[in-house]
Curated annotation (Swiss-Prot):
This is Thioredoxin. Keywords: Disulfide bond, Electron transport, Redox-active center, Transport. GO terms for molecular function: protein-disulfide reductase activity. The keyword Transport applies. The gene is trxA. Disulfide bonds join 31-34. GO terms for cellular component: cytosol.
Length: 106
């Protein structure tokens, strides 16, 4: 499954109403660590296909959702399960640690 790009307008449909857990990445194009983990998120999306959906929200273009969830720095990864945020990771992680973060929380 490919990484899905969401917006404030589509957040509820893409994340809250998802039938599988969602790893939500808050990012911005100017953020170096965000760009660094982007290919890792692509790999995670492929490896966890069918088990976890990976969704990205650009905080420069969509400010309501990160404000609502209290995002203060990026990258911030929030894992949603059954429409609720169950775990948060602030900062970039290597792929193996990100996979462990997902497995521990789904």
């Amino acid at each position: 499954m490919e990484v899905l790009h969401s917006t404030d307008a589509t957040f509820t449909a893409d994340v809250v109403n998802s039938d599988v857990p969602v790893l939500l990445d808050f990012w911005a194009p100017w953020c170096g660590p965000c760009r660094m983990i982007s290919p890792i998120l692509d790999e995670i999306a492929a490896e966890f296909s069918g088990k976890v959906k990976v969704v990205k929200i650009n905080i420069d273009e969509n400010q309501a959702t990160p404000a609502q969830l209290g995002v203060r720095s990026i990258p911030t990864l929030v894992l949603f399960k059954n429409g609720k945020a169950v775990a948060t990771q602030v900062g970039a992680l290597p792929k193996n640690q990100l996979a462990n973060f997902i497995n521990q929380n789904i």
